[in-house]
Every structure is written in C-alpha cells, then in structure tokens.
UniProtKB/Swiss-Prot annotation:
Lipidation (S-palmitoyl cysteine): 480
Compartments it resides in: Virion membrane
Pfam families in alphabetical order: PH_Rhabdo_glycop (PF24834), Rhabdo_glycop_CD (PF24833), Rhabdo_glycop_FD (PF00974)
Glycoprotein is among the record's keywords: yes
Region described as Disordered: 503-524
Protein name: Glycoprotein
Gene name of the encoded protein: G
Effect of residue 212 to A: In strain: Isolate Switzerland/G9337/1993
Recorded family membership: Belongs to the lyssavirus glycoprotein family.
Sequence ranges on the Virion surface membrane side: 20-459
Organism: European bat lyssavirus 2 (strain Human/Scotland/RV1333/2002)
Length: 524
C-alpha cells in the first residue's frame, strides 16, 4: 500500500483536521519571487514530508490493524441461571404419598458457573446429573422437603465488543451493555435477576484479535519522535496524531485515520469521541493500490510536462500545475510574471474545503491573506478568469476523491446498534420457561406431624377432635358409673331367700323365716 504514506503526509497539516481529509495543498508561506531558467524546474517529491528533518532511524516493533479487520468483534459466551428445585412429599394417615415439585431462582456464583460450563463442554456426566430432580423422601403424617440447587448453562450467547473501550453489547444485558469483563468482575449482569453472562474464554481480550505485529524504524530528531517508517518502507508522520486505546492497547490515531501502537509521543492529546479509526479492509487496500498507480501516473505526467517544457522551450499555466507539491511541507511554487518564469520557496499546507482556498469571489487565500495576482496570474497554474473567478486547473484525481469518501464512510461506530432494552425477562419468584434445571447438594427438611390441611382447618379439626374426645370421655364415665350402681343394687341369691319377709297371722310383718318359726312356736 504505497499510497498510505502519501495519504498520511497529505493529512499531516499544521492545523488539526478532525475527522476530515484534505483535497488540495496551498502555500501558507510564499516568496519572495525570483526569476529562474527552465532548467531549474523539477517535479516535487510527494512520497515523504521533507520539512521534519527526522534523520535518526531506530528499528522497533509495533502493532497495526489487520487487513480485513471488520467493525464487529464477536465474543462468544454463555448464560448461567441458578435454579432451586424443591420436592415436597406428604404421607397421609393411610400411607398415601403426594410429591410436588417447585422451582425457584437464585443468583449463581461465577465460580460455580465456570465449573458447570467446563463440565458441559467436556461432556462430564456431573453436569447432566446436576440437572436431575432431587430424590424425594417420605415420613408418615409428615411433610418432607428435599431441595437441590442447579445452574443451567445456555450457550452460545454472542456479544459484540466495542474496540474503543472493550464495552460489550447484547440484548440480554442490563440496559443493553456491559462495561467489560475483568478479573475483578468476571461476569455481566442481565435483564434476568438470577442469570449472569460470562465469556467462554476467561480472558475476553483474546477475542479482540484485530492486530498484527510489524517491524519498522522510528524517525527521531534530537531525541524527539516525529514519525516512523513502516514495514512497507513508507514514512508516516505523527503530526496531528492523537492518543487512542483499542481493545485496551494504547496507541496513536494518525491523521489519515490509521492506528499504530506507538505510545511515547508526549505531545499528543487524547482523541475526541468523534475521532474514530478507519476500517482496514480489502476494499480500501484495492482502492489504495489504484491510487498508487494514479500517483505514478501523475508523476509520469509531471515528467512528461517537464520534458515538453525542456524540448519546446515554452511553458504554460497548465504545465506549471503539474509541479505543485501534493503533500504538506517545504517545496517550490512557480508562476509567470511579465513573461518571465519565477520561482519562490513555499511551505504547503493541506486544506479540507475549497472555501478555505477560495473564501470569496476573486480571492485566493494563500499565506494567510488574499494573495495578489499579476495581470490575472497567481501561481502553480492558478489564474483569474475574465469574470473575476479564481480558476484552479487541477484538483485531486477522481480516484483519490473516491478513496477519501471511502475513508470517511469506513469508520468504526462508537456504539453498536444491538442493544434492545425492550426485551426484559420476567422477575417473578417462579422459574421461567427457558429454565429446565435442578441441581446437587440434597437437603432434607422433615416437618412435624402434618395432616395436610390448611392452618385454619387444622386448628378447627383439632378443636372438634378435642370436643369429641371430651364427649367420649364423659359418655364412657357415665356408662361406667351406671354399671357400678347397678352392680351395687343387685342382691346375692342366698341373701335374697333369707331376707324374704312373710306376714304373721296377727297381721304383723315377719322379717325372716326364723322369726316366723319362733313366733308360731310360742303361740302354740
């Protein structure tokens, strides 16, 4: 990509062009003019910035974006939901057993989720066993509650990572995003109170595989870093660069929108939120290749124009336009004054809008002012038309304009439009439909005697039973008393015979037979 350095130089203006790309170069310092011979004409070197004076080169390694890097960085993960399964068993008076299963939630710990995920991915039977219902137990006239805690793993669950701050985005995250996963906080909260999200790899930074390591040479002047020569041998300036972290790695965003992992440029400030990094894809590489061919063609056109000037010993404004320097820095400017070829030292700057060059009709902004013309002639082929308009004979090629439009459109969005806050899970106490789980560590709780009735019915039955029992006791006591009384009133058969009373002849009752005999014997 030989044009990458040219584009970098084009964008290394003395004034910061935030998020914009230059379309032309104009001298900000110009003069004085002096006559020259046509043999002093030369085509400018547009490959490097000549005014930085960075001559000390030191070999170093750096990282840059991979070719083919796309905006969306996918991070594979899984959701982990904690579920408590209760097996409630009641055995009634006749031994009939009733078992009821209930499921509730709990918030699982990250370590338990990581272990369960490892079991599931490794095919360990412990994971499937942990999902089984607890084995119920029973006791006569008692309610036995057996609980089992489980964690349900659902995978894959893919999130999108923002390369700028490593923020994760997904519809299931709380508020649609997660500030990132680290050793301190190894999970992300979700819209479900009892579900957490964790990356498949404990170190999610490995998902940010967008960099490649390259070797180059640092260019310094008096110990101060002012640029570097990349792996392709192209010089890139750090003028106008700003500091920017990608996937947690510190680096510099150059003015052409590219990014390199250079960190020791002390004068640079942090990039503003709208200064994004250009996508380095195959399309832009293809366009850059075509632009490089276009620049070679421009160089050949300049040499052809120069050869034509030398051969014909004549010059025109159009031919002078080929000699303009296309990148910021020191160069030459040429004009024709009173039919004399003139040359001046110039320092070129890049401009991003044509209004920066022609702010009003008839005004060519150069050197910080409306530059005066000589009989309708400015310099570098720029002239004044008869109706008073400034005419610039050349602009950047259509191919370069296409590349500029591509760079302006191919930027990484600061936030990914994937968060959908309308998706919320239920938050009731029962387990949702997506949960089918129940886990280890069985706990048994045996209640007291329970007839399986509601509380008021139970107290009512106890009261009725107490009254019935009291009535039964009273009835039994009454029966016993009556039986005892009957036994006491009934005489002995022998005594009954002895106690039979008779009536004497005199009419008086005789209590016994013996008395009767005595009485009758005396009378005789």
């Amino acid at each position: 990509m030989p044009f990458q350095a040219v584009l970098s130089a084009l964008l290394s203006a003395l004034t910061l062009c935030v998020g914009k790309f230059p379309i032309y170069t104009i001298p900000d310092k110009l003069g004085p003019w002096s006559p020259i011979d046509i043999h002093h004409l030369s085509c400018p070197n547009n490959i490097v910035v000549e005014d930085e004076g960075c001559t000390t080169l030191t070999v170093f390694s750096y990282m840059e974006l991979k070719v083919g890097y796309i905006t969306t960085i996918k991070v594979n993960g899984f959701t982990c939901t904690g579920v408590v399964t209760e097996a409630e068993t009641y055995t009634n008076f006749v031994g009939y057993v009733t078992t009821t299963f209930k499921r509730k939630h709990f918030r699982p710990s990250p370590s338990a989720c990581r272990d369960a995920y490892s079991w599931k991915t490794a095919g360990d039977p412990r994971y499937e066993e942990s999902l089984h219902n607890p084995y119920p137990d029973s006791h006569w006239l008692r309610t036995v509650t057996t609980t089992k805690e489980s964690v349900l793993i659902i995978s894959p669950s893919v999130a999108d990572m923002d390369a700028y701050d490593k923020t994760l985005y997904s519809k299931i995250f709380l508020n649609g995003k997660c500030s990132g996963v680290s050793q301190v906080s190894p999970f992300c909260s979700t819209n479900h109170d009892y579900t957490i999200w964790m990356p498949e790899n404990p170190n999610p930074g490995v998902s940010c595989d967008i960099f490649t390591t390259s070797k180059g040479k640092k260019a310094t002047k008096d110990g101060k870093l002012c640029g570097f020569v990349d792996e392709r041998g192209l010089y890139k300036s750090l003028k106008g660069a700003c500091k920017l972290k990608l996937c947690g790695i510190s680096g510099m965003r150059l003015m052409d929108g590219s990014w390199v992992s250079i960190q020791n440029h002390d004068e640079a400030k942090w990039c503003s939120p709208d200064q994004l990094v250009n996508i380095h894809d195959f399309h832009s590489d293809e366009v850059e290749h075509l632009i490089a061919e276009e620049l070679v063609k421009k160089r050949e056109e300049c040499l052809d124009a120069l050869e034509s000037i030398m051969t014909t010993k004549s010059i025109s404004f159009r031919r002078l336009s080929h000699l303009r320097k296309l990148v910021p820095g020191f160069g030459k400017a040429y004009t024709i004054i009173n039919k004399t070829l003139m040359e001046a030292d110039a320092h070129y700057k890049s401009i991003r809008e044509w209004t920066d060059v022609i702010p009003s009709k008839g005004c060519l902004m150069a050197g910080g002012r409306c530059y005066p013309h000589h009989n309708g002639v400015f310099f570098n082929g720029i002239i004044l038309s008869p109706d008073g308009h400034v005419l610039i004979p050349e602009m950047q090629s259509a191919m370069l304009q296409q590349h500029i439009e591509l760079l302006e459109s191919s930027v990484i969005p600061l936030m990914h439009p994937l968060a959908d806050p309308s998706t919320i899970f239920k938050k009731d106490d029962g387990a949702e439909d997506f949960v089918e789980v129940h886990l280890p560590d069985v706990q048994k709780q045996i209640s007291g005697i329970d007839l399986g009735l509601p509380e008021w019915k139970r107290y009512f039955l106890i009261g009725v039973s107490a009254l019935a029992f009291l009535a039964l006791m009273i009835f039994i006591a009454a029966c016993c008393r009556r039986v005892k009384r009957k036994k006491r009133a009934k005489p002995n058969p022998v005594e009954l015979i002895r106690k039979v009373s008779v009536t004497s002849q005199s009419g008086r009752p005789i209590p016994s037979w013996e008395s009767y005999k005595v009485e009758t014997g005396g009378q005789s």
